[in-house]
A protein has these predicted regions:
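Terminal amphipathic alpha-helical/low-complexity segments used for targeting or macromolecular assembly
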Residues: 1-63, 178-210
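Structural signal for interior beta-strand "rungs" in well-ordered beta-sheet cores
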Residues: 63-171
Length: 210
């Protein structure tokens, strides 16, 4: 798809992603995240053509107007929607694939000061990132994963999994561990009951001998 087609998709995101959307005029006043992504498209256009001062100037103005710090060197796919927008930070080497939903206060940050290396996360298709979540370092969030609000993610998250907490853990794995623990506990209880019965039988046998 061409440049303008991608921007048209950006403007269409509130209609499909936000149930509170009512009219196109709201795009001009109530969706700074849409404008942050559109402004990024122009900044990135100049950035990859080595007009980096122009790119940084565009991104700086956009940050002032939208509250989103989106580096023009980041790589964004199609249909990226930043809802509520304020306080979102996306670093220089971040990669975001198509159809990702990002809420306010999210940081896609780095954990290294090295230049010319990938320092920021890769976000695969269909990921949802809750408000205030921090995803740090050169890690990968798998397709259709969900990151809970205020989670701090420093390790890879697999496809279709949900990560929550500080530091983030995988909900499905925690649930599985609990189920395994319950199974072990139930097994131990069963064995204890059998042991108690055996002891009772031995005590009875001893009393009969006496």
């Amino acid at each position: 798809m061409n440049f303008w087609g991608i921007i048209k998709e950006d403007f269409s995101q509130p209609k499909t992603q936000d149930p509170a959307f009512n009219s196109c005029i709201e795009l001009f006043f109530n969706y700074p995240g849409v404008w942050a992504v559109v402004n990024y498209r122009f900044a990135h256009f100049f950035y990859i053509r080595n007009f980096k001062r122009i790119a940084r100037m565009i991104s700086g103005i956009s940050q002032f107007l939208t509250g989103v710090d989106l580096h023009p060197g980041a790589e964004l796919g199609r249909r990226i929607f930043i809802d509520h927008a304020n306080g979102v930070v996306i670093g220089q080497t971040a990669i975001i694939e198509d159809d990702v939903l990002i809420y306010q206060g999210v940081t896609l940050g780095g954990t290294s000061l090295e230049k010319d290396t990938k320092r920021h996360p890769t976000i695969k298709k269909g990921v949802i990132i809750g408000s205030g979540a921090k995803i740090l370092g050169n890690i990968t969030i798998g397709e259709n994963a969900k990151i809970g609000s205020n989670a701090v993610v420093v390790k890879d998250v697999g496809a279709n999994l949900t990560a929550v907490g500080i530091p983030a853990y995988i909900v499905e794995e925690r649930r599985k561990n609990k189920e395994n623990t319950r199974a072990v506990d139930a097994n131990c209880e069963d064995k204890l009951e059998k042991l108690e019965r055996k002891i009772a039988e031995l005590e009875k046998a001893l009393s009969d001998i006496k």
